[in-house]
């Protein structure tokens, strides 16, 4: 049997595949689904992926499955663990947090101001997949983000860094996170370029690029990447993109994603005049919250 697209979701507890047919017709079909336990502990996520495909074949009473394209998302091996470091919580740190959550990140720590020894100890303990540094409006305060970058660089980590702060600091960041640092640097537009202005979408896209570049930490994922068409993005980020598409069709909407390990709530809405009058800080059009350890594992 051959389908147009097979979509794989390699979750923290369960791997699910969904098969779609007739996508170029007026009546596209969601044809079948299969699932199996995610196999990180077995040392290769492809075991769980093949198990999910085998489950689909059993349900549809077919011997094998072929497909023109394969797409994939992942939250295996803990998903996209991030730490976020800004200048003021209600401004740059909050903007960076919204960008990270919207991209599908799981934020394990947020700091404001200059990093202290206890902050550095937490970062080392968390061992994040990605570090996001922000701070300062464009052409405003510079020193805090530079100080924090230097402290993180001196930790000797090999964790990629996204810088989304004052654009005047970008050349400094290149000097701090040079080749000798062993840390890949991603530069992006400021998430908080001026007072009461959020600019989170460019940062979200770069975070997802960084995730895809470094997804091979889940055993076997490097082989899955060779199988798929296009990037592998964090599962929560994929749900956010779907929520945005749903918004284009029906308007303001909320999506609740009950996973095996976490429950995510996504919302896409334009502020009403009544809400705008009582807001004390800007909110992004698309936003996500996440509650860890509140999933439903079946």
Residue spans of the language-model regions?
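Asp-based phosphoryl-transfer active-site loop
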Residues: 6-16, 75, 257-263
